[in-house]
């Protein structure tokens, strides 16, 4: 993605990473130092490339501002990402405990944290109203996330998980981690849509 220097924030890289760690404490659950650093770096890069001054202001999607705000900062991209990370971890552990299906916890948490990271550059607007920008209109959701993951040397399985999480893709999940992230993403999103009286992804 060509970077417009006008969109680069005046804060330092470390300032942005510190803020990302504050907003997404689930990053600390990734035990592998290299993978944890890559997740932070990808979030920092898309933020730097965007017009958003504050990551916490980005709505989850265009429907989010109209959804009931029952708690502070409900239905932002950050709270959605945190919800998917937490739901994924607990779901995977339940399936492992009750059915014996193992999973890679680090890969699962990292995938959950990165599944919507490209929305930072796909959407433009304010915390009260967003729409797809140039990249979001021309490139399928998740493709830029996958590109950045390839650039940082993440596994084919993790890249697959990001591509397969969205109904925009014709690829269905082929790993347990990808399957769990897809369903927990739908669960959190449909919870918002049901509360807002809108059509569910499930339909």
Regions found by a protein language model. Name each.
Residues 1-2, 203:
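Short intrinsically disordered terminal tails
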Residues 2-131:
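Acidic/His-rich, divalent-metal-binding segments that scaffold phosphate/diphosphate chemistry
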Residues 84-87, 138-152:
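An active-site-proximal "capping" alpha-helix that borders the catalytic cofactor pocket
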Residues 103-109, 146-150, 154-203:
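Histidine/acidic-rich helix-loop-helix segments that form or flank divalent-metal centers
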Residues 131-137, 200-203:
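A short alpha/beta connector and helix-capping loop motif
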């Amino acid at each position: 993605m060509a970077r417009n220097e006008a969109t680069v924030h005046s804060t330092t890289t470390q300032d942005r990473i510190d803020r990302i760690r504050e907003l997404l404490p689930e990053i600390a659950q990734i035990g592998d130092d290299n993978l944890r650093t890559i997740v932070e770096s990808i979030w920092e890069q898309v933020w730097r490339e965007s017009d958003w001054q504050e990551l916490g202001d980005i709505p989850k999607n265009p429907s989010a501002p109209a959804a009931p705000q029952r708690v502070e900062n409900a239905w932002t991209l950050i709270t959605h990402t945190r919800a998917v990370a937490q739901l994924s971890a607990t779901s995977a552990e339940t399936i492992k405990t009750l059915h014996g299906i193992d999973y890679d916890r680090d890969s699962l948490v990292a995938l959950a944290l990165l599944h919507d990271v490209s929305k930072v550059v796909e959407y433009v607007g304010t915390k009260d109203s967003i729409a797809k920008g140039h990249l979001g209109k021309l490139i399928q959701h998740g493709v830029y996330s996958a590109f950045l993951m390839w650039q940082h040397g993440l596994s084919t399985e993790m890249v697959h998980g990001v591509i397969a999480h969205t109904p925009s893709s014709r690829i269905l999940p082929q790993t347990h981690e990808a399957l769990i992230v897809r369903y927990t993403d739908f669960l959190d999103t449909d919870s918002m849509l049901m509360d807002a009286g809108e059509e569910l992804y499930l339909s």
